[in-house]
Amino acid sequence: MTLRSHVVAFAPPQQAAVRRINAALARAPRLRTEGWRIDAGQRLSLWLDAAAGRVTTPRLKKRGVTVEIVQTDGEHPVNLRILHPAGAPRAVILDIHGGGWVLGSAGLNDRLNAHLAHHGFCVVSVDYRLLSERRRVYIDAAIADCLAAAFWTVTNVDRLGAATLFIAGESAGGHLAALTAVALRDKGLIDLVKGCVFTYGVFDLSGTESVRSAGPETLLFNGPTMQADLARLAPDRDEAGLRQPDVSPLYADLTGLPPALFLAGEYDPLFEDSLLMATRWGEASDADLIRVPEVPHGFLHFGGPAARGARKAIRTWLDARL
C-alpha cells in the first residue's frame, strides 16, 4: 500500500508552450451547466460526434484500427464504441469519457483513445446518458450505464481477445470510472481489472475546498458556480447526501481495488480531488500521482507538452502492469 507522487518538470520551451495555451483559455468562455446551455451544448455535441466519426474512423482504419459498435442488454441499452487494434490486443481498456456529465461521447473520445489503440490496446468507450434537467436524467442514470458497460466488458473480455482489463476515465469519466471499479469489487469481479487510470477526475460531488474557493479567474470552468454545478447532478440530495459513497467515491471503501494512476494539473480547481483520492487509494492499495504544474483541467484536449507527456506516462504505467 503505497502512494508515489511525481511532479512533472517542464523545460523552458515547454513551459512557454503551456503558458500560451493558458493565455488562450483565459480569453475563452467558461463552461457552465444551466439548463439551456446544456441543451444547446448537447445538440452541438451530437453534430460534432457525427462529424468526428466521419473523420476519425477512416484515420483509425489507415493505422489498422477497426471500429465496432455494440449495445448492452437491459431496460436502457448502452452503446459501446470499440476500437480494435491492428493485432491481438495486449489488454482491454474500459474508457469513460469526460464532459462534465453533460457533454461528450464515445466517438468524440477517439482522438484521446487513438494512441492506446495504436499501442495495442482494445478500447471500449461508453456512451452513457448525459445529464438533462429537462428530461430528468441525473447522475444515477450515468452510473447505471457505466456499470452495464463494465459488466458487458467483463463478460466479453475473451471475445475481445484479451485476458486483462483496465478502467480509465477523465474528468467526469474519472468519477464514473472510480464508482465502476468499486461496484465491480462489490460484485466479486475486480480480479480481472489490473489497474485504473484517472485523469483529473472528480471524486467529491459536494465540492472539495479548492472547488468551493474557485474564483472568476479559473480556466475552463466558471469558478464561482462550480459547487452549484456539481449539486445539479443529484438535485434530490443535500450536501451530506452528495458526500455519500454511492455518488462520491472519495468516501467509498477502497480496499481490495487494483493499483491506480492519477494525473492532475495544479491549476485545476479539481486538483484537490485527485490529491485526496490518490492519498486514500494509496492507503488501501498502490497509487501513483502525477502532478502537472501550471496546467488547467482538461489539458489532454489542448495538445502541447502536457498532453504529450500525459499520454506517454499513461502508456508506460499500463505497460508496467502487463
PLM segments and residue spans:
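Hydrolase active-site cap/lid region
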Residues: 182, 186-240
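A glycine/proline-hinged amphipathic helix-loop "lid/cap" segment
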Residues: 1-82
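Short beta-strand element of the alpha/beta-hydrolase
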Residues: 90-100
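Short beta-strand/loop motif that positions the catalytic acidic residue
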Residues: 262-264
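Catalytic nucleophile-loop/oxyanion-hole region of alpha/beta-hydrolase
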Residues: 105-106, 112, 119, 124-164, ...
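Proline/glycine-enriched tight loop/beta-turn segments at coil->beta junctions
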Residues: 75-78, 84-92, 121, 255-257
